[in-house]
Amino acid sequence: MNTRKEELQDRAIVRIAAHLPDLIVYGDFSPQRPSVDYFDGVLMFVDISGFTAMTEKFSTAMYMDRGAEQLVEILNYYISAIVEKVLIFGGDILKFAGDALLALWKVERKQLKNIITVVIKCSLEIHGLFGTQESEEGLDIRVKIGLAAGHISMLVFGDETRNHFLVIGQAVDDVRLAQNMARMNDVILSPNCWQLCDRSMIEIERIPDQRAVKVNFLKPPPSFNFDEFFNKCMTFMDYYPSGDHKNLLRLACMLESDPDLELSLQKYVMESILKQIDDKQLRGYLSELRPVTIVFVNLMFQDQNKAEVIGSAIQDACVHISSVLKVFRGQINKVFMFDKGCSFLCVFGFPGEKAPDEVTHALESAVDIFDFCSQVHKIHTVSIGVASGIVFCGIVGHTVRHEYTVIGQKVNIAARMMMYYPGIVTCDSVTYNGSNLPPYFFKELPKKLMKGVGDSGPVYQCLGLNEKVMFGMAYLTCNRNEGYPLLGRDKEIKYFMCTMKEFLMSNCSRVLMYEGLSGFGKSRILMEIEYLAQGENHRTIAIALTKVSFHQNFYTIQILMANVLGLDTCKHYKERQTNLQNKVKTLLDEKFHCLLNDIFHVQFPISREISKMSTFRKQKQLEALFMKILEQTVKEERIIFIIDEAQFVDYASWIFMEKLIRTVPIFIIMSLSPFTEIPCAAASAIMKNRNTTYVTLGAVQPNDIRNKVCLDLNVSSIPKELDLYLVEGSCGIPFYCEELVKNLDHHRVLVFQQMETEEKTKVTWNNLFKNFIKPTEEFKMSGLGNEEGTEEICKLASGVRLKNLSPPASLKEISLVQLDSMSLSHQMLVRCAAIIGLTFTTELLFEILPCWNMKMMIKALATLVESNIFDCFRDGKDLRLALKQNAASFEVHNRSLSLQPTEGIAHGEEEELRELESEVIECHIIRFCKPMMQKTAYELWLKDQKKAMHLKCARFLEENAHRCDHCRSGDFIPYHHFTVDIRLNTLDMDTIKKMATSHGFETEEEIKISRAGIPKNSELFSENLSPEEIGERILGFFDVILTKMKTSKEDIIPLESCQCEEILEIVILPLAQHFLALGENNKALYYFLEITSAYLTLGDNYMAYMYLNEGERLLKTLKKEKSWSQTFESATFYSLKGQVCFNMGQMVLAKKMLRKALKLLNRIFPYNLISLFLHTHMEKNRHFHYVTQQAQESSPPGKKRLAHLYQQTACFSLLWQIYSLNYFFHHKYYGHLAAMMELNTALETQNDFQIIKAYLDYAMYHHLAGYQGVWFKYEVKAMEQIFNLPLKGEGIEIVAYVAGKLSYIKLMMGYLDLAIELGARAHKMWALLQNPNQHYVVLCRLSKSLFLKNRYKHLIQMLRRLWDLSVAEGHIISKAFFYLVCLDIMLYSGFVYRTFEECLEFIIQNEDNRILKFQSGLLLGLYSSIAIWYGRLQEWDNFYVFSNRAKTLVSRRTPTILYYDGVSRYMEGQVLQLQKQIEEQSETAQDSGVELLKSLESLVAQNTTGPVFYPRLYHLMAYICILMGDGQNCDLFLNTALKLSEIQGNVLEKCWLNMSKEWWYSNCTLTEDQWLHTILSLPAWEKIVSGKVNIHDVQKNKFLMRVNILDNPF
């Protein structure tokens, strides 16, 4: 039975009937319109307060999760309760109007007395519902009820597509008046109702000076049985459910199918509702908080109450209103009698109906409706209120009776303006500002205090939309601000400068057209051009058109000529007339002067000839006259005519301009939005003219967006997070950027404060990334920054999550216009894509699209790519490349395009779409062009639908949420998924096998791979070989492996390179967000930790930090649920925090985090010396145990144990490096213990890779500490371990890793020849293994070794490879290192590979790159090198700029070769500064010298500074000594440096040392600009290769450090 009932209730007719009252559903009406029906009844008007305030609260909410749906739930919770009461008591809900409803009890007149009692009982029970409740949102919901009874008329009216009905009569007026009198929780009876009711049953209270009364309560006699009374009353109600249907709320729920009835009922329902009823996919689609424009029309009549009298007037008005709205996609939402009149609530921008220029169209419609209705007989006053903004549009009510309605402050404002400003068209300030119409179309009205809307801002009267020629008012709309430059538009201005030059030098016309969408800053460009175009021999005329200009014949030329003739400054028509007479007397006979009357608003007497002339002839005469005037004018001065919004140029003006540019030399500059329809022939001819330059505007680049934000906010820097949000969200469109900033400011997200000095702030995790992005250099040089000392910075308010912010209403509107212009199926695709995220794969989209086939999807995607909704990319690399730059402006060659045959064009379009389809098939990554579209489309979903879609996405993505096949599909955090149960899908055996092998469990087959030709370790290290021989054998082993890799037929080498970065971006990042949306916090945390680990692998410390913060938020919420897995997650969390701090050079913080992680992993690291020695003793025993037991096979640890061990190894590996950085003697014991604990933990894992890494780390620790015997032993152990590995997959990677790591150790220790040999082999291996992340590291180190050996040929080869790799992979660190070596070559090798300017440009462009900025060492080296360059040139201002930037990075100490390389350069810069101080005989020179010497000595004394840096450091120490007159120590340091260079084979330093030695002790003096002469003569590498320059001569191009011992003041 229930199923049958559900089926019935799901019928289309039942769903339509739910939108209509029984009065219509069961009505019997004549087909003529208007038609009138009469009856008696009781009316109840219920007004619910609190909803508008709630709608406002939701519509201005910051975050996307507070959507329409939550609002619908709250609204309908209350309204459905009221509806239910009304239906139970036999009422019929006639209308819902926003937050009010009107109900009717239709009965014969004699039944009114009893029915009024029933209605009063119903009213009191409704009040009872709200007496005690308070909404969950903390809003007080209260109701006011008015009751009336008597004669009622019903009027049905409409056109052939849509019907409306109204109830009219005294009772309708009375019920509204009664409700108006009511206060909260009152029930008021109208005078007539009080007259007709059973007074004995009702206790009332009189209202002073009123005939209406207030009901206190019902007072039935003791014997009264209400149920019996009620049942008796209901027998008089025609459609009250009884008998079999007595349990139903409404009889209409059981309507049988009836096509005729269905057809007639459909006419009463809005088209969008019918669409939703037909298409079940769209359920819930119409409930939205969305920006709309409300047009409230009120008609007052001479004879108010007679339906038959006013019916025809309402019918005429309705037909006209409908026809006007249809043109602009507006809809009549409601019609009702309202305070002495009939009101139409019209809405523009309903779901599916959003159109561009909505506000303009609404005003245009309002004026049209006003003009028409004012002429209709019997209508004596027309008042219209127009307001724009966000309102709630949605279905409100109960499942059995509801309506589509709009609720919000803007609806109230429009209604109030309509009532308080009768007889005119009014609009609010939002509509005024958004109309893009000239101000003279409006007049600001005096403010009135309007009930219920508070201060709604200024109110304007719309005076009409006929363009009046207000001379001097059509100027450009924006004003140029001297202090506000045009940012990021140099290329566009260049087009103007070139065209201007051509125009001034030639005698023919030029046209420059800038085409761009709204918001691209076209008006700003023209404003700048107007300023630049000012000159002595030419006149500039600049005008801005509006939408209305298009409909005014010859308007553009009218304004141009008024300016040329100087009429724009005339105050009065007589002044204009005199001016015109003087200008045209020689060109035009006096009797023809009256031709100018209409066009220039003058009053010359009309001659007989002109009165006989046809309009066409008059126009031709005028055009001829204007042409003569312009020909005459250009002989005296050139004319530059600038037109903004040129898409609104009228047809006649285009024709004249086309003729004009052929006849008269004139320069026309236009900006225009893309034409919506094909432009007229004249406009096309201008675009195709050979002298036209047509530029399509591109977006502004990220750097300029940042500069713009700093300028708009008047700050010196903004947070990195804000920078990323604005760059991504604005897509380089200036208007988008402004709106986003306004929105943030509105929500108080931006906090401004004085800039703190670097020293003041103590480093904590929260301020670890003092990531303030400053404007670019060029911007600062333009002198627009703040004055020194008063610099303010912008910060984000705490706890703000930018990516969850709701888009600003203005941008939402733009997206909705685009969405609503699509077909329903395309809308559905975009909305589904929005759930997946900003970037998604075609596979996942196909998975979640309901009932689509692949062909349909590809076709739809191609169309959406063509209309710039989506971009498609072949792979992650293409995507990353595209995101770095925005599309720039470009020139369109319309002339060459026009030469194609027309049928070819149509064919070309089809061909283009086909090509796009095949491109989409090839590209599997799709991304929204604009993030705002994704956010807007996402917000349209209902909560349950969202959840279901997120779940689908999560299930699909989860299968691929691991490392790529190249990296053997493991977790980014080893064995992570074994410790935490997070999967939705149950694992199949294949997946488990795959994941197990990824962590180094070889299968039998893998071990049996042929190892022929590879020596066994017994063969390698059998006898007592010398270190040199062992070295040779090791190199031989690597050569054998390389040969095997190149020639083996087995699949040793992977088929493709590492795809982990792509998997991170398109699988794991979205998956974490899906779990977050599903409220699965533990799963989201798991993936946030994976993401962090992945970003650390990719060298992106900033993103790792951001996602750790996301994880921290979740950890706090999960802390309440104590479980073991959370302990592991916490440990991993601190371990990852430690890694980020370590990479950022914040060692105190890193140590704290790593200790916390170890504590959670049950491996406490000692805090005091007693505990230290105890632990050391234990670890030594443990090590001895592992070494002796190694021969015996013991069972490997379980997976969960392995997860712990891997984390412990990572922590210990960082800890020993941190302790090695410290000078205090006891720290070396801590360092040694950490290194040993790492080794023992690795041995426990029984994993070859872990053991080998630990052996090499242990060797490295002893290398740096200077224990020769120990390090050698462990390097040999590591080698022995790799001989036993299977040469496949991970085995080969371990071999490559060992070669690279040994090469690094040898470079640090200064064994340059061995470093090069090992590095070359490692480079070849990683190249074959296609692992760019490892490959670039080896190439960088190899380049460094070759550079120190002066092996330039090989060096340049490696640099080329490094460059190719950096370009192919879009890899910033390898590119930065490339430029670092290029600077080195110029500074120390004496030739040029890439120019200094190119290197400097790279640094300026990329210093804010998030990977480079937070990578310790590289930027320090680059800044220091530039500082050295300027220091050598004695350009001290530039030196200080870069030296100070380097200084801020020195404190980020990390024990890496890059950091020490950077520090040694920084010290060199400081030494040059010291030399300047000594020369200037500065008082602080002596102290500075001593301080510098100490710093250099401590660097040499530090364990972690590799010996490879000693020669340079001793060289600098020697220079300081000679500057300070300490010859003895100078000799000592010089000789030490020379000796070390000799031992290491450091040819570069040795050569420079010898030159310094010779120079310092000679009597020669140095010219001031010696380095300038040197750099001017630096040869390019090409000259050296071609033999034009001898390589030995090049070595003399070294900087000679200036000394002047004779004048030494010390």
Swiss-Prot record:
Species the sequence originates in: Oryctolagus cuniculus
Q: How is this protein's activity kept under control?
A: Activated by manganese or magnesium ions. In the presence of magnesium ions, the enzyme is activated by bicarbonate. Calcium mildly increases the enzyme activity, also in the presence of magnesium ions.
Q: Which InterPro entries match?
A: A/G_cyclase, Adenylate_cyclase_typ10, Nucleotide_cyclase, P-loop_NTPase
Substrates-to-products reaction catalysed: ATP = 3',5'-cyclic AMP + diphosphate
Name the PANTHER family for this protein.
Answer: ADENYLATE CYCLASE TYPE 10, TESTICULAR SOLUBLE ADENYLYL CYCLASE
Q: Which SMART domains match?
A: CYCc (SM00044)
Localization (cell) = Cell membrane; Cytoplasm, Cytoskeleton; Cytoplasm, Perinuclear region; Nucleus
| UniProt note: domains | The N-terminal guanylate cyclase domains are required for enzyme activity. Fragments containing the first 470 amino acid residues are fully active.
Q: Write down the required cofactor(s).
A: Mg(2+); Mn(2+)
What this chain does, per the entry, is described as: Catalyzes the formation of the signaling molecule cAMP. May function as sensor that mediates responses to changes in cellular bicarbonate and CO(2) levels. Has a critical role in mammalian spermatogenesis by producing the cAMP which regulates cAMP-responsive nuclear factors indispensable for sperm maturation in the epididymis. Induces capacitation, the maturational process that sperm undergo prior to fertilization. Involved in ciliary beat regulation.
Name assigned to this protein:
Adenylate cyclase type 10
SUPFAM superfamilies according to UniProt: Nucleotide cyclase, P-loop containing nucleoside triphosphate hydrolases
Q: What is its EC number?
A: 4.6.1.1
